Structure formats: C-alpha cells, structure tokens
C-alpha cells in the first residue's frame, strides 16, 4: 500500500480538540492541542477546507512527480543506482537539497529515490576519514566535483533525521543500515574537539546548532536551521546514548527562537548570534540591516512542524503563526514580497538569487514563501489562515514575470508545505 493509502487523520476522521464534520465539508481551522508524538495522528488542513482527501493525495503526488520527475525536475538519476538533487539556478548539488530530497522520499515511501540520493551523497559528499569525518561537503558540481568543501549544519541535521526515519520505515537489512549511517554522522560529530578548526555541528555547551561546524560559522547560527522536533526524533530512536542531550537541544532551540523573532512582525534575520542578537552583515560591500531573506522563508514551516509533531510550545507558536500571517496579510496576501527587514520595512538592497543567465534580482511574490507561510496554519487560530491555505492550493511553480524561475527552492518548499497541510509529513515510528 502506498503512503497515500494509509490513514490520514483529518478533522473529519479524528477529534483532537476539533469538531467532526463531513469529510468534504469545510470546517473552522483550529490548531490541535496535542502533537503527533503523542497522538500518532496528523491534520489534513486541506480536508478541513473541504477538499476530498483523495483529491488532496492526488495533488500531492502530482507535485512530487513535478519536482522529482517532471520536465522541470530537480532530481537527476546517475547510472543504475544513484541520483542527486540540483539547485539548477546555481548549477550545483547541495547538502540542503540532497537531505531535503531524502526527507521527502522517506515521508512518501519512495525507497528507490531515497537510496539513490543517499548513495550519491555518501560517495561524493561525505568525508569517510580525516578532520571532516562523517560530515558532508555542502556544494558539489553535478559530476561530483567538490565546490564547497565545508559542511553546512542543516544538511547534517536533515541527513540524520531522514536516516533515522528510513531505519524506522524500511529496517536496516537492505543495502544500507540506515541507523548505523545516522549514528556515524552523530558519533563523528560528537568526537570532534576543534582540531583543524572542526567542531561538532551542535554546540555542546549551549545545545544550539551552528551555522557551520568549521571556521567562523561555529560562533553563530541560522534561525532556519532550528527544528526542535528533529532532536526529539533522535532522542527516541537514534540509540546513541545521547537522548538527554538531544532533549536539551530541543528545549534550547525553542528558547532561542523566542529570542530571534520580532514579536511585532514575526520576522527573523537569516543569521544571528546564539543569544538571538543581530549580526551586522555585509554583501557586495553593502552594510545591511538584519533582514528576512531566502533562508528565513523556512522558519514558519519549521515552527509548524514542531507544533504538529511535539506541540510543546503551543501558546508561543500559535501567537507566532498568527503574527507572521498577519504581517504578510498586511502587505497584501497576493502581493507581499520575499525580503523584508526584520522590523517589517522594505529592504534597501534585495539579495539576488542564482547565477549567470538564471540569476534573479529584486524581490518578487515567491511561491516558496507563499508555501511556508501557509504551512504556519498548523499552529494558527485566526480566520485569515484559510486564505493562505487557499493560495497554496491554487499555486503553481512557474517562471515569474521577470523570467526568473526556481524549480529547486520554490519547488521543494511548495512540496513540503503540501505534505504538511495534507497530513503527510509525519513522525515515522518503527514498524510494529
């Protein structure tokens, strides 16, 4: 049976603080009061909106096929048993995309795609020995040539979680022992003591993920790297003897997010210090105010994930979801742009994206941000959340008016958001 044939718990199927109505009848959208770790159930917000679950599942499968196998795909097979995810506009394969692809694949029970991606990542990206042992080079050319040799910590975060889920879903008796692969990353990181400037990708003292585990990046972080519920997955199933540490990481990450997000706008900077204070950044010689840019788009969806799975910070996360949706609504639900200063003012300089003829400049109403703000509905409790969900349902990932097109980042964030709001982004527990 495919993952779409398994029980999806919509408000029409289970009541967790929500009134039951007909399966295709629109309902009031209200966040659940318990998370998937406890209930083993996941909302289908689209079903609550009145869409039949079969139609929702078919649309999700179509979006998966678009991203992985369609004319504008970002998943490319290599030989008989490997594949990579490409940030096409930057002409590379990144640990971000590789680990995202693996997470999508394990969530949707696509074992072939998962194994192909991990086989490529292990062969070309992962260091098997030396100071970087266990880590992954963050950027490679499609032929496997390393472009950026250092790790980016969010890649390791997603690799570990996806591998633990693969172990739980498929077992460890095939080509890979997924659990051992996850433990290899975690154990290798834990053993690092600063030799050659390489440290653990999660700071042992403050329990917060680093921007990078090498160079200057060990001294600060990125709000979009913070997904507290992932640490709770590790605490339950990584089986490496560090469960208490991971639980402390989850708590520290939630506390850090409280300090990092503007209470009036719901916005955060792309990077900041561990205490939540701003870092003064420069780009192309320009001094820039702390701004919500491309990395930051992920934060609304990450907080929605933590709410959906753990529901451990309900009051703050619901207030956050309402605040950030209110901010973008105030900018025009169909016209808000994808970069703002944290205080909500317009940026003086728009960060470009892509390279060469695929480069995009300026700001736009990006579908990736439309998607992640809609995903925040899992935690929101106000009426306008429905409008954001509707915009996601009606969205398409296609070239913008200026010709810019991002099949990779926009495409993957849109896919993740559909997974969340269809009830198909779950804690994957061990098979019983």
Regions found by a protein language model. Name each.
Residues 20-26:
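Sec/Tat signal peptide C-region and signal peptidase I cleavage site
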Residues 306, 360-364, 372-383, 389-432:
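A cross-kingdom marker for long, charged
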Residues 1-6:
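N-terminal secretory signal peptides that target proteins for export/translocation
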Residues 45, 53-97, 105-127, 132-148:
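Internal amphipathic alpha-helical repeat/solenoid segments
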Residues 27-62, 91-95, 130-135, 148-154, ...:
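Extended ligand-binding clefts on enzyme/binding-domain cores
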Residues 101, 113-114, 175, 182, ...:
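Solenoid-repeat scaffolds in large eukaryotic assemblies
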Residues 91-101, 145-170:
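Aromatic-rich carbohydrate-recognition surfaces in CAZymes
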Residues 10-19:
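Bacterial N-terminal signal peptides
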